[in-house]
UniProtKB/Swiss-Prot annotation:
E3 ubiquitin-protein ligase that participates in multiple biological processes including cell death, glucose metabolism, and in particular, the innate immune response. Mediates 'Lys-63'-linked polyubiquitination of TRAF3 thereby promoting type I interferon production via RIG-I signaling pathway. Can also catalyze 'Lys-48'-linked polyubiquitination and proteasomal degradation of viral proteins such as influenza virus PB2. Acts as a negative feedback regulator of TLR7- and TLR9-triggered signaling. The keyword Ligase does not apply. The lineage of its organism: Eukaryota, Metazoa, Chordata, Craniata, Vertebrata. The keyword Metal-binding applies. The modification Phosphoserine is found at S4, S8. It comes from Pongo abelii. Interacts with PKM isoform M2, but not isoform M1; this interaction may compete with that between PKM and FGFR1, and hence reduces FGFR1-dependent tyrosine phosphorylation of PKM. Interacts with IRF7; this interaction promotes IRF7 proteasomal degradation. Interacts with TRAF3; this interaction promotes TRAF3 activation. The RING finger domain and the coiled-coil region are required for the apoptosis-inducing activity. Zn(2+) binds at C101, H104, C123, H129. This is E3 ubiquitin-protein ligase TRIM35. Its EC number is 2.3.2.27.
Length: 492
């Protein structure tokens, strides 16, 4: 039952004063009674006695002892009741004044819909609220409660959305753990291949150097053997010449002609043959560059498929070079993934230079191959939820589609008519960023199909792979190996 605003629920002032400690003048806390009959807080009287030689009552000064302290349960109960009633009185006063107009002291029975304020009957005539829509509190509360129920429903839906988003992040975290383990193994395999390539190259260079060293050592040994033999011949000739010089004059001169002819036939020493030193530059000169070029020759693909952009219909091979449409399967949600069509992107972003790639289409009956502009605000993933893939939305491609008179090739430019060309089984794409040209060729027939002219900006390779029309197994779309060359420019 609601109390009248005129009734005061609080205790009398004199009664409250009887429940105050004579030391701290606050309501008793753990009240105790001395032998003389006076009451104090246990803590207050204990602090007073700490500075006294002989404990006495703080009021009448009678002698006392800590052993005389007796807990006064009745007084403690009265203090607890007093504090409880004061708290209740404070709440009642707050409640009573919160429902009364502070300006006119009237009952708050109206609500201003413009100012969103509670009003009394006198406030309604106030100039500040003239012309405003005013409703009774009960009606307004009913309307606002209905709105709050709608807000509650909206908040519950938002909470469900947050919970669904949390489950999405849980799925992403689990996917990343599995993907990281698989990716770690693949990375190690690829680096093992690189290390094996470098090991083979290192061994080949060391073997070539060892073979050159062996050949030049054999040549040096042969030359040294020849020189040793010639030296021995000359030593024998010197010894013979010394003996002839000791003979008498007639004998010495008789042998002069044959001696001169013999000495003339002795060989002259040849200079050191060129190329006898190990060719250091052959093995160390630009070694890293030469090995890098050789390594580059083993790289056959200009880019790979990006599985993070692949729609739920598509499955990308482990080596990221082929993609197949196996029908829709639930994938981890991420903003980069296409959701409205079976599309995916290449791993590279092209903004300058010349680039080319070839795609094996085989007997695929529904495909698109081209590029898509990378949006500056959100990247290529800004296109992932778009249903309109044409030049107006940043897509440039050639595709195979069904027509009344059979399949034919068309472009993403709605202004062009269908291309009257045979369906290519292998498509070559050439992108000239600076020239603003994107050309398509039938790689098997070596014929030009179509060329877009536009300011492309930053683009990524774009692919669409429709489902199989027949009952046979789905065919993959593959990026074809190409020979990658390096253009060398020398300064000056």
């Amino acid at each position: 039952m609601e109390r009248s605003p005129d009734v005061s629920p609080g205790p009398s002032r004199s009664f409250k004063e009887e429940l105050l400690c004579a030391v701290c003048y606050d309501p008793f806390r753990d009240a105790v009674t001395l032998r003389c009959g006076h009451n104090f807080c246990r803590g207050c009287v204990s602090r007073c006695w700490e500075v006294q030689v002989s404990p006495t009552c703080p009021v009448c000064k009678d002698r006392a002892s800590p052993a005389d302290l007796r807990t006064n349960h009745t007084l403690n109960n009265l203090v607890e009741k007093l504090l409880r009633e004061e708290a209740e009185g404070a709440r009642w006063t707050s409640y009573r004044f919160s429902r009364v107009c502070r300006l006119h002291r009237g009952q708050l029975s109206l609500f201003c819909l413009e100012d969103k304020e509670l009003l009394c009957c006198s406030c309604q005539a106030d100039p500040r609220h003239q012309g405003h829509r005013v409703q009774p509190v009960k009606d307004t509360a009913h309307d606002f409660r209905a709105k709050c129920r709608n807000m509650e429903h909206a908040l519950r839906e938002k909470a469900k959305a947050f919970w669904a988003m949390r489950r999405s992040y849980e799925a992403i975290a689990k996917h990343n753990q599995v993907e990281a383990a698989w990716l770690e193994g693949r990375i190690r395999q690829e680096f093992d291949k690189l290390r094996e390539f470098l090991r083979v190259e290192e061994q080949a260079i060391l073997d070539a150097m060892a073979e050159e060293t062996r050949q030049k050592q054999l040549l040096a040994d042969e030359k040294m053997k020849q020189l040793t033999e010639e030296t021995e011949v000359l030593a024998h000739e010197i010894e013979r010449l010394q003996m002839e010089m000791k003979e008498d004059d007639v004998s010495f001169l008789m042998k002069h002609k044959s001696r001169k002819r013999r000495l003339f036939c002795t060989m002259e020493p040849e200079p050191v043959q060129p190329g006898m030193l190990i060719d250091v530059c052959k093995y160390l000169g630009s070694l890293q560059y030469r090995v890098w070029k050789k390594m580059l020759a083993s790289v056959e693909l200009p880019f790979s498929f990006d599985p993070n952009t692949a729609a739920g219909w598509l499955s990308v091979s482990d080596d990221l070079t082929s993609v197949t449409n196996h029908g829709y399967r639930v994938q981890v949600e991420n903003p980069e993934r296409f959701s409205s069509a079976p599309c995916l992107l290449g791993s590279r972003v092209f903004s300058q230079g010349s680039h080319a790639w070839e795609v094996a289409l085989g007997g695929l009956q529904s495909w698109r191959v081209g590029v898509v502009r990378v949006r500056q605000d959100s990247g290529a993933e800004g296109h992932s939820h778009s249903c309109y893939h044409d030049t107006r939305s940043g897509f440039w491609y050639v595709c195979r589609t069904q027509g009344v008179e059979g399949d034919h090739c068309v472009t993403s430019d709605p202004a062009t008519s269908p291309l009257v060309l045979a369906i290519p089984r292998r498509l070559r794409v050439e992108l000239e960023c600076e020239e603003g040209e994107l050309s398509f060729y039938d790689a098997e027939r070596h014929c030009h199909l179509y060329t877009f002219h536009a300011r492309f900006g930053e683009v990524r390779p774009y692919f669409y792979l429709g489902g199989a029309r027949g009952a046979g197994p789905p065919e993959p779309l593959r990026i074809c190996p190409l020979h990658i060359s390096v253009k060398e420019e020398l300064d000056g």
